[in-house]
């Protein structure tokens, strides 16, 4: 594993929006610090948290990243239409 993870980075997201407007993240990719493109399929959404003043939503999730199961937090900003990975556990789940 030569790649090093950074946090608070933009991600390209594939998500599903149901007829009620509920957004469910499914897969994403990001560029790590050495420039490698990392693709991630979300295994489980542990928690969904609406942010105050309708600015966005946070998702605590788990997935296999670099061959290890990791817990991480994704954030979607409604006004910017932007997804970010804002934190990731350095330890395997």
Place the predicted regions along the sequence by residue.
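Cysteine-centric segments in proteins
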Residues: 1-93
């Amino acid at each position: 594993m030569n790649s090093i993870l950074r946090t608070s980075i933009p991600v390209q997201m594939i998500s599903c929006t149901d007829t009620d407007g509920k957004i469910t993240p499914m897969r994403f990719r990001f560029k790590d610090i050495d420039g490698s493109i990392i693709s991630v399929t979300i295994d489980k959404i542990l928690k969904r948290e609406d942010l105050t003043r309708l600015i966005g939503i946070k998702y605590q999730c788990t997935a296999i990243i670099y061959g290890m199961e990791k817990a991480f937090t994704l954030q979607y900003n409604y006004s910017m239409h932007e997804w970010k990975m804002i934190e990731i556990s350095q330890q395997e789940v």
